[in-house]
Amino acid sequence: MFRNQYDNDVTVWSPQGRIHQIEYAMEAVKQGSATVGLKSKTHAVLVALKRAQSELAAHQKKILHVDNHIGISIAGLTADARLLCNFMRQECLDSRFVFDRPLPVSRLVSLIGSKTQIPTQRYGRRPYGVGLLIAGYDDMGPHIFQTCPSANYFDCRAMSIGARSQSARTYLERHMSEFMECNLNELVKHGLRALRETLPAEQDLTTKNVSIGIVGKDLEFTIYDDDDVSPFLEGLEERPQRKAQPTQPADEPAEKADEPMEH
């Protein structure tokens, strides 16, 4: 994308009917590390890939706790996500204090849509540069919602956002018919397999770079990090690309592996 006379402010329309500042914010989501959300009849699961800014830094948190029945995973600007997460927590607290009941997931997503729409229509403001996957469980069952910097939000059976997320979405589309009948362990494994598709061929999922969030019937939202992720990774089969590569004798050069597709 290149600068032009129609991208100076979010209130300026281009002749093609586009708002470039919003499109730039959507690009920020694509730069964030990938995250996957999917649901069955009883549970909703978030799986996220964590990044470290440098070898000296700890991995950033990608899954955040909102309420006992809701959690989010993020892709994009972490600072913007932190602000939206605090807003969501406050709304959930208000619901419990005023009405003595958990806030319905769809109502919370609607409030987030209204809040993120305001900067897209006011001079001198910029859109939030973060996309959210919201997992929750209420009287209507498990939910996975996606929110965008454009203030649109979508109710999904499964979704992936972030860098190279198209590979994960392809996996989800291919196996979507299996999710509703899955037990919790199988659902998490599907999420891990989809997330693994976003990695280059030479990398794999580890306890350091994966975070898992689970919520469901009779199960409050729980985040699994570091060693807590091990039981889920142990049951995961090896990547098909690695299985297909036989060990080459020392005197025979190994064939060059296919380059991972860029998305």
Swiss-Prot record:
A GO BP annotation: proteasome-mediated ubiquitin-dependent protein catabolic process
Region (Disordered): 232-263
Main location: cytoplasm
Keyword tRNA processing assigned: no
One Gene Ontology cellular component annotation held by this UniProt entry: proteasome core complex, alpha-subunit complex
Key words of the record: Acetylation, Cytoplasm, Glycoprotein, Immunity, Isopeptide bond, Nucleus, Phosphoprotein, Proteasome, Ubl conjugation
Modified residues (N-acetylmethionine): M1
Compositional bias (Basic and acidic residues): 253-263
Placement of covalent cross-link Glycyl lysine isopeptide (Lys-Gly) (interchain with G-Cter in ubiquitin): K115, K208
UniProt modified residues of type Phosphoserine: S110, S177
Compartments it resides in: Cytoplasm; Nucleus
CDD domains per the UniProt record, alphabetical: proteasome_alpha_type_1
Residues carrying sugar: S110
Subunit annotation: The 26S proteasome consists of a 20S proteasome core and two 19S regulatory subunits. The 20S proteasome core is a barrel-shaped complex made of 28 subunits that are arranged in four stacked rings. The two outer rings are each formed by seven alpha subunits, and the two inner rings are formed by seven beta subunits. The proteolytic activity is exerted by three beta-subunits PSMB5, PSMB6 and PSMB7. Interacts with NOTCH3. Interacts with ZFAND1.
Family in the record: Belongs to the peptidase T1A family.
Function summary: Component of the 20S core proteasome complex involved in the proteolytic degradation of most intracellular proteins. This complex plays numerous essential roles within the cell by associating with different regulatory particles. Associated with two 19S regulatory particles, forms the 26S proteasome and thus participates in the ATP-dependent degradation of ubiquitinated proteins.
Protein name, entry field: Proteasome subunit alpha type-1
